[in-house]
Amino acid sequence: MIEIVSSANPKFKLAMKLHERRGRQQQQKILIDGTREVRYAMQSGIEIETLFVSNSVLAEQIEHVTELVNLTAGSAFYLAQDLFDRL
């Protein structure tokens, strides 16, 4: 997993735009929060493009996160906790 520590990172900026309706419509993407919700989305046939993981989630749910990373068609990024909290 690649670590993102700067809010200037293009992937992080793109994710932040998804907080607004306009950003979601322009990009035709949504944010899904939580390992359980990501799993439900995948079971429903939604392709996960990017997975963001925080250090606290990684520490608490390492097996679930590892499984999700392996099943994700896109990329997985480890976010610094302050950035993850902003998402």
Predicted regions located by residue number:
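Boundary-proximal intrinsically disordered activation/regulatory segments immediately upstream
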Residues: 1-64, 71
